[in-house]
Amino acid sequence: MKKFSVVIAGGGSTFTPGIVLMLLANQDRFPLRSLKFYDNDGARQETIAEACKVILKEQAPEIEFSYTTDPQAAFTDVDFVMAHIRVGKYPMREQDEKIPLRHGVLGQETCGPGGIAYGMRSIGGVLELVDYMEKYSPNAWMLNYSNPAAIVAEATRRLRPNAKILNICDMPIGIEGRMAQIVGLKDRKQMRVRYYGLNHFGWWTSIEDLDGNDLMPKLREYVAKYGYVPPSNDPHTEASWNDTFAKAKDVQALDPQTMPNTYLKYYLFPDYVVAHSNPERTRANEVMDHREKNVFSACRAIIAAGKSTAGDLEIDEHASYIVDLATAIAFNTQERMLLIVPNNGAIHNFDADAMVEIPCLVGHNGPEPLTVGDIPHFQKGLMSQQVAVEKLVVDAWEQRSYHKLWQAITLSKTVPSASVAKAILDDLIAANKDYWPELH
């Protein structure tokens, strides 16, 4: 079996060790000859990489491992780029969340004004990675799971139309895992689903087991009462996530025939979200206080002891979708996966050039979207508004346009008026002066 060379772009991410453990657990179906980390923050990456070096030496010494801040060294001779970058890191996420809340608007990583701000930082970073890949390994594929995926996907569609990049999100996968628990299946691979929408903005219309039995009635009944909180809920799930999974019952009530993506909470119940937010302590603070500290302390312990048992790093099980995607391309498996792709008529009554999240069959040539057909007015109306926001953000970045970004924030369903949008925008510009292009 062919062995592959992979570079993880965003090597200093706290998600990287879990992805390395997941890659090691999947060597039987996706064997590696080389693994490289790339990051523009060398000091941060070094801690993560040195810990991963210990793990790799123990579990797979035959895999050639290196880490670098040099794009040429990182992107030369690779088959896949696995990208999860966060431009501005968590301190800027904190600004994305807290600035809108100061104006009475929800503050969220990928939704509303915060997601727009993050998108304006991410576009340039992801395009830079695409360009490095095309320069140094023109036959490679980029598997991008950097957020905000919807805005990034629109930017790559428009500004790098021929790039071999696939944009994928783990949120539907996480929700499907909970659905499988609710109906008593071993895992989400025991289900066959139909889903459509945009990234962080979609609906399941059909869920069956592999024998073709309809699981929707049982799911509807359960979710109407408990949301996506499964019977044996993981005690380690943070309070903010538990609230999001529980709130799905109210989102689902709007269209009881479907199962919603949890992120719709932010668009359909923004008043609830603001009322239940603490403007002084947002999700970014939770992550910095817990995940960031825990992963880095575990890595330092592993480095000091020279053995992996010294630190508690968890395998990122549901990140196995990244391996599913890579193996589908490498071995032409025609795996069915939810990807963010140009609509091109898959949803009949929706914009052809909108980036939609729908089931695709994946092989050597990338994704082949499955037909969705017509969608109802409710979903179409919501999606049209949100697609317009995403397109305006890319317009703003490309044209360096203050007005386009003001329009984008005004059009967001989370924002009550153009005057509030302008006040938020002006604060975001001040906070992002080191990251955004200068707007005129």
Swiss-Prot record:
Pathway: Glycan biosynthesis; sucrose metabolism
Sorted UniProt keywords: Carbohydrate metabolism, Cobalt, Glycosidase, Hydrolase, Manganese, Metal-binding, NAD, Nickel
GO molecular function: maltose-6'-phosphate glucosidase activity; metal ion binding; oxidoreductase activity, acting on the CH-OH group of donors, NAD or NADP as acceptor
Database matches in Pfam families: Glyco_hydro_4, Glyco_hydro_4C
Induction description: By the five linkage-isomeric alpha-D-glucosyl-D-fructoses, or by maltose or maltitol.
EC assignment: 3.2.1.122
Site (Increases basicity of active site Tyr): E109
Cofactors: NAD(+); Mn(2+); Co(2+); Ni(2+)
Cofactor binding notes: Divalent metal cation. Requires Mn(2+), Co(2+) or Ni(2+).
Annotated positions binding substrate: R93, N147, R283
Top class in the EC scheme: hydrolase
UniProt binding sites for Mn(2+): C169, H200
Reactions this protein catalyses: alpha-maltose 6'-phosphate + H2O = D-glucose 6-phosphate + D-glucose
InterPro entries hit by this protein: GlycHydrolase_4_CS, Glyco_hydro_4, Glyco_hydro_4_C, Lactate_DH/Glyco_Ohase_4_C, NAD(P)-bd_dom_sf
Domain of life: Bacteria
Family listed: Belongs to the glycosyl hydrolase 4 family.
Quaternary state and interactors: Homodimer.
Protein's job: Is involved in the catabolism of alpha-glycosides accumulated via a phosphoenolpyruvate-dependent phosphotransferase system (PEP-PTS). Hydrolyzes a wide variety of 6-phospho-alpha-D-glucosides including maltose-6'-phosphate, isomaltose-6'-phosphate, maltitol-6-phosphate, trehalose-6-phosphate and the 6'-phosphorylated derivatives of the five linkage-isomeric alpha-D-glucosyl-D-fructoses: trehalulose-6'-phosphate, turanose-6'-phosphate, maltulose-6'-phosphate, leucrose-6'-phosphate, and palatinose-6'-phosphate. However, sucrose-6-phosphate is not a substrate for this enzyme.
This protein's name: 6-phospho-alpha-glucosidase
Organism, scientific name: Klebsiella pneumoniae
